[in-house]
Amino acid sequence: MSSHPTKITFFEFLTPLITAGKKTITIRDESESHYVPNTEVEVFTLETDRKVCDIKILSVAPLKFDDINEFHAEQEAIELPKLKELIREIYPNINELYVIEYELIK
């Protein structure tokens, strides 16, 4: 039986977008790409490790930085320039990323 991640962290300022169902993807690097579709994951704040909600992983797919577009920005509930800036701050020299799609468990 293979283990899979059961916890994911987000910056605190993003968590209201998740609980409102507006943010439905996250873009991560390879080290955080091991989530498994159809599994439930607990969401915590990065800063304070406070549990926020539960999500169900829908898909995990490779994504190059240059391919991040308006569609991803909509799913992230953030403007495209700000999204790309945030990704670059977190992953300064990484172009091989992963998009993790999820849904809020109510």
Curated annotation (Swiss-Prot):
Q: A single GO CC term, please?
A: cytosol
User: Which residues does the Swiss-Prot or TrEMBL record annotate as the active site?
Assistant: 23 (proton acceptor), 26 (nucleophile), 76 (proton donor)
**Which Enzyme Commission number(s) are on file for it?**
3.5.1.135
Name the InterPro entries for this protein.
AC4CH, ASCH_domain, PUA-like_sf
Enumerate the catalysed reactions.
N(4)-acetylcytidine + H2O = cytidine + acetate + H(+); N(4)-acetyl-2'-deoxycytidine + H2O = 2'-deoxycytidine + acetate + H(+); N(4)-acetylcytosine + H2O = cytosine + acetate + H(+)
Record's CDD domains? Answer: ASCH_yqfb_like (cd06552)
One GO molecular function term of this record is:
hydrolase activity, acting on carbon-nitrogen (but not peptide) bonds, in linear amidines
**Stored SUPFAM superfamilies:** PUA domain-like
* NCBIfam families linked: PRK04980.1
Similarity section:
Belongs to the N(4)-acetylcytidine amidohydrolase family.
Biological function = Catalyzes the hydrolysis of N(4)-acetylcytidine (ac4C).
- Listed PANTHER family: UCP029143 FAMILY PROTEIN (PTHR38088:SF2)
Annotated protein name in UniProt:
N(4)-acetylcytidine amidohydrolase
- Organism classification: Bacteria, Pseudomonadati, Pseudomonadota, Gammaproteobacteria, Vibrionales
